[in-house]
């Protein structure tokens, strides 16, 4: 009992001394001036145009879908023809004829509805909006990297060049004062390079990645481009490109690519 009381007193004494030392150190430290520039520090934005189309399935996925469809057809219950067709009726004879033509066919759709499909295609509406559009756009054909209308099934990331001699990098701006939060600086940055009508959404207020060099540290925040199909020319930059994930490796510096390759993906 005596030993336990001594241990409790020692813990209280240590805790009291620790809090006093922390309070004294805080009081003795000088407050950081809000107007002090943060040298070698900048904030950037990973601006993403989200995928617009679903991705194309791989050959392996296509084979799985085909196998599952065939298996489902084999395991499905046969149609109770005696319930739907009267014995000896014209409908029963037509049904039996169609069943004979289905033997050995992988898909019975064309055999059963082939005639109806041709009639439907011959009576197409004149409105072009009802027709299927190609997944390959004009920007894909011309390899226009400035357009957001390319690679519609993948995410696109904005890279800029500040001058002719500089390399490709994410849009960034130096942090000249500690009075403004990082996410507010990112919003001002996007307003500076994009049109005022462009709509963006900052995903979070905290940094997603850190690009660190000997001269500078760049904190990256993530933002999404909401009007991804109508992006005007960028302002206050020398050049810009919208890159897929695979193209980032060839554009960014090796150190920058190593910092972001594990936090970005082909479809983000």
Curated annotation (Swiss-Prot):
Transit peptide residues? Answer: 1-25
GO cellular component term of the entry, any: mitochondrial large ribosomal subunit
Q: Which CDD domains would you find in this protein's record? A: NUDIX_MRP_L46
Q: Where does the signal sequence lie?
A: none
Keywords (A to Z) from UniProt: Mitochondrion, Ribonucleoprotein, Ribosomal protein, Transit peptide
Where in or outside the cell it occurs: the entry states: Mitochondrion
- InterPro entries documented for this protein: Ribosomal_mL46, Ribosomal_mL46_N, Ribosomal_mL46_NUDIX
* GO biological process: one example: mitochondrial translation
Example of a GO MF term: structural constituent of ribosome
Say if the entry is tagged with keyword Transport. Answer: no
Gene3D superfamilies (UniProt xref): Nucleoside Triphosphate Pyrophosphohydrolase
- How is the subunit organization of this protein annotated in UniProt? Component of the mitochondrial large ribosomal subunit (mt-LSU). Mature yeast 74S mitochondrial ribosomes consist of a small (37S) and a large (54S) subunit. The 37S small subunit contains a 15S ribosomal RNA (15S mt-rRNA) and at least 32 different proteins. The 54S large subunit contains a 21S rRNA (21S mt-rRNA) and at least 45 different proteins.
Tell me the protein family, please: Belongs to the mitochondrion-specific ribosomal protein mL46 family.
Q: State its role.
A: Component of the mitochondrial ribosome (mitoribosome), a dedicated translation machinery responsible for the synthesis of mitochondrial genome-encoded proteins, including at least some of the essential transmembrane subunits of the mitochondrial respiratory chain. The mitoribosomes are attached to the mitochondrial inner membrane and translation products are cotranslationally integrated into the membrane.
Protein name stated in the entry = Large ribosomal subunit protein mL46
